[in-house]
Amino acid sequence: MLKLFTKLFGTKSERDLKSIRPYVEKINLEYEKLVSLTNDELRKKTDSLKQYIKVETQEFIGELEIRERQLEATTQLTPKEVEDLYIQISRIKEQYNTQLEKVLLDILPQAFAIVKETARRFKENEQLIVTATGYDRELAITEKHIDIEGDQAIWKNQWEVTGHLLTWDMVHYDEQLIGGVILHKGKIAEMATGEGKTLVATLPTFLNALVGKGVHIVTVNEYLAKRDAAWMKPIYQFHGFTVACIEETSPYSAARREAYQADITYGTNNEFGFDYLRDNMASQQEEVVQREHHYAIVDEVDSVLIDDARTPLIISGPVEKGNEQEYITFNPRIKRLYEAQKQIVNQFLQEAKSQMVAGKNDEAGLPLFRAYRGLPKYKPLIKYLSEPGVKQLLHKTENYYIQDNSRMMPEADEPLLFTIDEKHNTVELTEKGLEYITQQGEDPDFFILPDTATAVGEIESDAGLDNLEKEQKKQILAQEYAIKSQRIHAVQQLLKAYALFEKDIDYILVDGKAKIVDEQTGRVLEGRRYSDGLHQAIEAKEEIKIEKASQTYATITLQNYFRLYHKLAGMTGTAETEAGEFYDIYHLDVVVTPTHKPVVREDKDDKVYKTVREKFNAIIEEITVLANQGRPVLVGTTSVEISELVSKMLNLRKIKHQVLNAKHHQKEAEIVAEAGKPGTVTIATNMAGRGTDIKLSPEAKAAGGLAIIGTERHESRRVDRQLRGRAGRQGDVGSSQFFVSLEDSLMRLFISDRIAKIMDSLGLKEGEMIQHSMITRSIERAQKKVEQNNYAYRKRLLEYDNELNKQREIIYRRRRDALLGHRLGAEVNAMLFEVAKSSVMQQGVKANYHVLATKFSYITGTLPPITEEEFHTYDIQKITDIIYQAFLSSYMNRLAVFKEQGIAVQMNLPDHIADIRAEYLSFSFSDSERRLEVPVKIADFMDNAGEAILKSLERVAIIYYLDRYWQEHLRYMDELRHSVQNASYEQKDPLLIYKFESYALFSTMIARANESIITYLLKANLLLYKASDEKPKMVEKNKRIELEESKQDIISLLRERASNSSEEILKPQPIKSQKIANRNERVTVQYEDGTIKENVKFKSVEEDIANGKCILLETR
């Protein structure tokens, strides 16, 4: 059916290209019209397009300005009126963007033609002479390729790029125009190596820069950002666009802010993301560097949106107390445990071998399976599994023990100290293992968490204890629980470090530090640390300095950062295999762009060997033959360890070669430049696959082109395609060949027994191999399975992060409005009402008078304006209005007080205050609990002292308390995500519970922040003031926090934490223990407004519970 559909309507790529080719024809028609124009006339075309865009979108811009003025002008808007205005503004912005995209599509042919004609003129002329503009004169001061002679500007076609003088020699061809259209439409363009992605990006960049809202071009490393910016910027600058690279500026600096104000901004994905987080930690408006996120083009988009999907950007600071000592204390025990397990596994392996030799295959199955469960990567075991019939026996035994929900598995695991599930990358300590690490004389429950529910019940029912003694005992129980929880967590992480993470594969040691190696690229991930204490465990294992634990202050995933953009596009050489994921998660369509010249590279079927030793011997022979033929050879490896192994084997043969891996990355540019010469052998991890272009010498082409040798298949087809793509660029000859053994990880875990049976039946001798298209297809099917599993994990993680992202958007919007001084009156008014409402209501029902009186007195320092009798007589709405009016009256009194104090300060200021260097007056406020420094601009203060003081205090208090509670909330959310994983053991969906609990937690956090802000505003007193030429930071007096930026790998929490069945974290208040019922059970629920529904079926309210609209009280 699919074949018939394809035959009738063509492939997706054919249909995509059919819709794009008309644009190419229009672009070329416009291009022909431009040839006769002078250089000045060509430049004026750009100005006319800018003007056209303004005219066509002016209606919506005018409406937006009216709505914004309404928000700014009115301070007494109700929360409902503010929300309505936000909705109107959002709707107008959507209409504006729709109109804008329509206009841009209309002028696309003209804009693309201008870029192409500019490129042609630079290629065919050594210099372009134009009438000098002010911008030309400004550029000529710093740019060597621009000269000013009288009223003329002379643009040369040579300029410096990363230290080398480059002569422009490129003009866009039709396939690149196709790529440009794809990128402008907000899609992903898959373009083969050497097809000129950097040049393609100039087309949509130019078109979208006409809008004036900024275009961000995102690269995967600093070198590419600087190179591409320097390489392409003269094309843009010639037409009056400003171009900057954020990598050439410092964070927080005025230069960084100016870089974002440029029409076109280059930078790395990490730096764009970190700047967003820094902006949302800024204490002054001048510290904010980014502006609206309008349009971004992401280079190597699959690397950013898929490979880095589990990697959040984090800004963190120190915590008061770390747990480094736990890892130091228990490391020797886990090391002994791991060595003891090795001996046990070796004994089971020898037993299995003996039974097999004796022909007792049935008896050999269990010890073989136990060895596999104990240490699946144990090299003697892997070697033995390549023997005829052994792997089939292992799978047969495994199937027996996993049947009936793994009912028999405890019997198989009983002699082991810990078990490893290699497919899910988890490890779990057994009861025997717990006994092993518990030392003599220690409490037998030293590593077992207490049953708190039972213990609390016993304390409550103990009639011999008074209330104070009960509280003391419960406090001791909670402390014991926390200590044991931390201890067990350290042991679990140490066990993972020993059992699941290998040096020179997962990480390397450099200068006494453990640095993570990216499995996709082979590069060192500078600044990234494994999360949840795992990195500290690895440091303890390697006996290097254990870095201190840190607290998260701000975090965002790259995926959620790029979702901020109105329009997002991407480029890569390998996206088609992940097209489904791009569309499902990011709504990005993948379009394959045709190559300029046909690809003539020969991709050979995989060569499959029985053992790793035979495979590597064959690889060395192949390299020798190819190098002797004068062909350059690129050997792709999956880890640092394998690259060094191949290097040693080549040294024994005295074959000259270069090694490019995470340990030798400094020489990357130099090694790649030499890799295309005849007979050159280059060994590289996957890091040679991106951002590099191996150009062949004429002699190398004549010898047969670049030969790619893959030492094993990667889990991802994309990585293999990246490696193949190094050869055959721009129609060059070349070849690719993968060598595989049955001992490779992918083959062991995911290839069916069928291939092993075939090889056994063929009776292959030492060094012989099989090579067939059927085998290659079977391997690719296995890769698809792994990709599907990884996609499921990434999607699940994204679903968790989406909950936090919704909360982040709310907090950051409120914080940004406060920082910029937008709608402060409306914001404070809304908080006054919410705090009044929460003072009257508790858990959705009317509070008692004592609670109301206590809270009102704490917030205002006065008695409530309502008696207990009135409280019981009036309804909730009336009481709320009374309390709100009292809060509002108190707030207006503060304004009057500050006005009087401000006038007094004004009278004491020197007459020449406006002439001195100071820009701010710094006021100190205190509510007897906390002291804040509040900067007030002198100009605002002199104009209206009281209002200037109050507005500045509002801004400082809102930002201070939002930051304080948000940072605390981030820690709670991380602990929540950890703790809900145990719900899977109760057949409950952890994500559903996480959504419900996180909503309750966020609501409580917002309520606490609002109350703290209002309390401070109503109680804080002015202490002193001073003139200052610096903008004070909004932190507590004498408190300065050193921040650090990092990328932490959350390593698929669902996978990593699945092994922690015995581990449970005490959830911080106010998380409520949420019950979950069966769908047909009768339940009682309470809604936010206090309404209680009794005896309803759980399935009828399940959605409301998931959305946080109600809470489950009991089941029947």
From Swiss-Prot:
Gene3D superfamilies: Helical scaffold and wing domains of SecA (1.10.3060.10), P-loop containing nucleotide triphosphate hydrolases (3.40.50.300), SecA, preprotein cross-linking domain (3.90.1440.10)
Protein's membrane topology: Peripheral membrane protein
EC number, as in UniProt: 7.4.2.8
Pfam family, one: SecA_SW
Keywords of this entry: ATP-binding, Cell inner membrane, Cell membrane, Cytoplasm, Membrane, Nucleotide-binding, Protein transport, Translocase, Translocation, Transport
SUPFAM superfamilies: Helical scaffold and wing domains of SecA (SSF81886), P-loop containing nucleoside triphosphate hydrolases (SSF52540), Pre-protein crosslinking domain of SecA (SSF81767)
Cellular component GO terms, alphabetical: cell envelope Sec protein transport complex; cytosol; plasma membrane
Residue positions binding ATP: 176, 194-198, 693
Cell compartments where the protein resides: Cell inner membrane; Cytoplasm
PROSITE patterns hit by this protein: SECA, SECA_MOTOR_DEAD
Top-level EC class: translocase
GO terms, molecular function: ATP binding; protein-exporting ATPase activity
GO biological process: intracellular protein transmembrane transport; protein import; protein targeting; protein transport by the Sec complex
Domain of life of the source: Bacteria
Known catalytic reactions: ATP + H2O + cellular proteinSide 1 = ADP + phosphate + cellular proteinSide 2
Role played: Part of the Sec protein translocase complex. Interacts with the SecYEG preprotein conducting channel. Has a central role in coupling the hydrolysis of ATP to the transfer of proteins into and across the cell membrane, serving as an ATP-driven molecular motor driving the stepwise translocation of polypeptide chains across the membrane.
Subunit structure: Monomer and homodimer. Part of the essential Sec protein translocation apparatus which comprises SecA, SecYEG and auxiliary proteins SecDF. Other proteins may also be involved.
Family named by the database record: Belongs to the SecA family.
NCBIfam families: PRK12901.1 (NF009536)
Family matches, as PANTHER family: CHLOROPLAST PROTEIN-TRANSPORTING ATPASE, SECA INNER MEMBRANE COMPONENT OF SEC PROTEIN SECRETION SYSTEM
Protein name per Swiss-Prot or TrEMBL: Protein translocase subunit SecA
Species, as recorded: Amoebophilus asiaticus (strain 5a2)
Species classification: Bacteria, Pseudomonadati, Bacteroidota, Cytophagia, Cytophagales
Gene name linked to the record: secA
